[in-house]
Amino acid sequence: MKKIFLRIVLLLILANVGFGDVIQILGSNYSIYKGNVYYGNEILEGANPKTAELIGFSLLKDDKNVYYMGEKIKDVKIKNFEKLGQNYWKNENKIYYRDKKIEN
């Protein structure tokens, strides 16, 4: 019985060797792999894989920026960022739908 248990443990250990670089899928287009954030197969330069999270359809947020379809949305202050609902978000006094500012 002890030999069977040791074989199972050894098999589980060996099965995990080489799988340390697991890809993390965020929605249908974003992913995190080997310390980089990707949109499709393109690296999002400057995106933080530790804080990246999908917040809506093709919208990704990290600790510094918001991205829509892999493009950084300009003039966004993450400190004042607030998600309102699916694909709607607020930054300071501006409300956005995806990457478009909604005019008053």
Question: Which residue ranges define each predicted feature?
Answer:
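Generic cytosolic/nucleocytoplasmic N-terminal low-complexity/intrinsically disordered segments
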Residues: 1-2, 60
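Non-catalytic tandem-repeat scaffold regions and their flanking low-complexity/translocation tails
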Residues: 19-104
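Sec-dependent signal peptide recognition
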Residues: 2-11
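Hydrophobic h-region of N-terminal signal peptides that target proteins for export
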Residues: 11-20
